[in-house]
Design a protein with these regions (language model features):
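Membrane-embedded alpha-helical bundles that form conduits across membranes
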Residues: 1-295
């Protein structure tokens, strides 16, 4: 009874708190699918939710409710075992949907109580071409529901214990920038990421552009009290060439993306795949603007 009463009081306090960038905390829905194929996706959600975040792992089973109850119970048991075995502070959920693509919106809207509704939805980057159109429809749905998007393109092994590490945030404008830096900072606070340098990177065509953008990046890091190194790359080479030259040996890259217009999904997917062919594990983000480190 005591624990429940404390939870209730704290939820009431959260309800009355005015939302701003200073008290923003990640509340994350992670769609994991087959758990043993998305281990690094789970790992990233754990890093992002460290200490102050709430992370729900979601497995969606498609089918009729009456036909899938046993499968749901087995899946939930497997997820609980995985969480306990790996000592993760994550919350499992298994949902039966007749159709995932049409049921996603209702699930996200109905998940959790008002003060701790999810503000981030995480997916793994699709591997099968047959899922591309559906994947982008999901991103569009999440955007319409005013949630931040985080997609992890997993290139597997990316950490060496005890070594110096680098996280590169490539800045291409203001829409996603603050959110990218916040994610990089949250990840860097985990013990696995000790000795990490966060680099705020931007490509400009000439020396005249360098000073303005360098000051902007330095100002954002200072205002947010995040230790980060701002680096401006002067180059007229393609963005892909610059990215490969400066970040191929980094441990993690964070990039902003936009949701393509209907009919442009395959072209967008192909362009991202080409851009990141030689890159390490990359987090692709689409921000709703609720994190503004300049405010």
């Amino acid at each position: 009874g005591f624990i429940y009463s404390r939870i209730s009081r704290n939820m009431q306090i959260l309800t009355k708190m005015k939302e701003n960038s200073k008290n923003w905390r990640p509340t994350i829905l992670v769609f994991v699918g087959v758990l043993n194929k998305r281990v690094n996706l789970v790992q990233f959600s754990k890093w992002l939710g460290k200490d102050a975040g709430i992370v729900s792992l979601v497995n969606v089973i498609t089918g009729e409710l009456k036909d899938c109850i046993t499968q749901r119970d087995e899946s939930l048991e497997q997820m609980n075992h995985f969480i306990e075995l790996n000592k993760l502070a994550l919350y499992p959920e298994v949902v039966i949907m007749k159709d995932f693509d049409s049921g996603l919106s209702s699930f996200i809207q109905g998940h959790s109580l008002a003060p701790i509704k999810p503000n981030i939805v995480m997916f793994g980057w699709p591997q099968k071409e047959t899922r591309i159109i559906h994947f982008y429809k999901h991103l569009q749905t999440v955007t319409e529901l005013n949630k931040n998007i985080v997609c992890v393109m997993d290139k597997s092994y990316f950490l060496k214990q005890g070594s110096k590490k680098v996280i590169d945030c490539w800045w291409r404008g203001c829409d996603n920038g603050s959110f990218m830096i916040m994610l990089a900072y949250l990840i860097s606070q985990n013990v696995e990421w000790e000795n990490t340098t966060i680099r705020l990177m931007r490509q400009v065509p000439n020396e005249e552009e360098k000073g303005k953008h360098l000051r902007e990046l330095q100002h954002i890091a200072t205002e947010a009290r995040i230790e980060a190194h701002a680096e401006i790359v002067i180059s007229n080479e393609s963005y892909q060439d610059v990215l490969n030259k400066h970040s191929r040996e980094s441990n993690l890259v964070v990039l902003g993306i936009e949701i393509p217009a209907p009919g442009q999904e395959l072209a967008h997917y192909t362009a991202i795949e080409k851009l990141l062919t030689q890159m390490p594990t990359t987090i692709l983000v689409k921000s709703i603007g609720d994190v503004d480190l300049k405010s």
